[in-house]
Amino acid sequence: MTNIRKTHPLIKIVNDSFIDLPTPSNISAWWNFGSLLGICLALQILTGLFLAMHYTSDTATAFSSVTHICRDVNYGWVLRYLHANGASMFFICLYLHVGRGLYYGSYLFKETWNMGVILLFAVMATAFMGYVLPWGQMSFWGATVITNLLSAIPYVGTDLVEWIWGGFSVDKATLTRFFAFHFLLPFIISALVMVHLLFLHETGSNNPTGIPSNMDMIPFHPYYTIKDILGLFTMILVLLSLVLFSPDMLGDPDNYTPANPLSTPPHIKPEWYFLFAYAILRSIPNKLGGVLALVLSILILVIIPFLHTSKQRSMTFRPLSQCLFWLLTADLLTLTWIGGQPVEHPYVIIGQLASILYFLIIIVIMPLVGLVENHLLKW
């Protein structure tokens, strides 16, 4: 008799996706982050669900409801900090996952890659709206500043901003709708993740060499399930260390002050995982130009498959491209640092140079280096 996991209509889908899935035999730990992202998403939905049971999306009570969760709800503080720091873990895994895709040429699976870019935008939108919900100073002013960027859109900008706000400023209507969307989006993300996986399983996984591995596949279970569990334990260790020892390390102290529309914080800045994009936004003195640069800093990922000039897929055997990749990584870390600094000399000029370098590496230098490497190898 054939095993039920291979015949049952529903279990068969799980089997083909996680158990009998043919996987390249040489994929490294960099391929762990997909499963970790799935676990992060599940954790965020679960902790978010329990937090939503006690949270109130009203400007008068939102801040105190979060305080109530931390003080009066059984293990509410664990839920709150797991959710807040879980978002940080989510973005760490996301950026490493995207970095892996860039390094090993996984972006040549165009459907999977583009789906991933859509997912990145969706997760960023969700995280932004979630940051507004505690209704602290940085929540309020972050929401005001970022939504106000849409007013840079010619002709319809101002109307669009007021439509999103539900009034003439960030207020009760804004908070309520942000809570509604913050609750809804993770479920949409879950559906998009399934499409992402569907596209991936059409082609099969890439591997560190970038060479097709159809002749050397092994089943996902037990070889990679055990490897994923190691990654999971490592992530849980880091997350619990954050939650239990320094839960506020990645947050902003200003968010422990209730939102006050009459008092602007000295330095308005988003959570750490948006600082690189925020630095790019601030480095352009023109409002519309800044908004375009902000969107393009992420949207640029869509054109990367079309800028691939090398005859080799992966960077494993391309030392020049490797140097550029790590230069890009250092550049992004520099932008992240600059995004958290005040707008004054020398931070402004450093941010502008780092922003120019970011776009220059991706659009110009990397494709040229790919051609140079082809020439050096006489291809």
Swiss-Prot record:
Changing residue 23 to A: In strain: Isolate Macedonia. CDD domains: cytochrome_b_C, Cytochrome_b_N. Binds 2 heme b groups non-covalently. Its main location: mitochondrion. Changing residue 156 to I: In strain: Isolate Macedonia. Changing residue 372 to M: In strain: Isolate Macedonia. The cytochrome bc1 complex contains 11 subunits: 3 respiratory subunits (MT-CYB, CYC1 and UQCRFS1), 2 core proteins (UQCRC1 and UQCRC2) and 6 low-molecular weight proteins (UQCRH/QCR6, UQCRB/QCR7, UQCRQ/QCR8, UQCR10/QCR9, UQCR11/QCR10 and a cleavage product of UQCRFS1). This cytochrome bc1 complex then forms a dimer. This is Cytochrome b. It comes from Pipistrellus kuhlii. The lineage of its organism: Eukaryota, Metazoa, Chordata, Craniata, Vertebrata.
